[in-house]
Amino acid sequence: VIQYLPYIFIAAVAAAVAFCLTPFLSWLGERQGLLDRPGVRSDRTVHLSPVPRLGGIAIFAGFAIAVAIWLGLESPVVRGTLVGGFLIMLLGLIDDLRPMSAKVKFLFQLAAALVLVLYGVKIEWLTNPLGGYIYLGNWGLPLTIFWVVAMVNVVNLIDGLDGLAAGVSS
């Protein structure tokens, strides 16, 4: 168990940051009228009363602070991950406040994925379920961009289901 303490600590930091920010962001969302009202924008919403729309900020803050503590900010890959993640969080926030077209969201997601790639984040290898690894070579860049955009949309699809996105993302 002792060898896992650093991992437990960093997970606890991320959870604590998100946990501490959530009440403030909920209060702010309610005070500013930044609420997701059932049936107004999406039929995927399952809650029966309005809920604040600022939860993504708490999730990202927990992630970013934990990553900065754990890995530091010296690595371009870490910085790229945080910048790209911030852009996606910002996209979600803007879309929550002023809905955007699918085309605009896609272009924003593509830009965030390109930022990751420019910072050196790239899928280079795939694990072969039959054993060994598969080197992707030049296919790594388009696969990385596709994967980032796909995962952003997967989380977006489950967002609004009362904490499901937060749980899956954590």
Label every model-predicted segment.
Residues 2-170:
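"…together with the soluble PPM/PP2C metallo-phosphatase catalytic core" -> "…together
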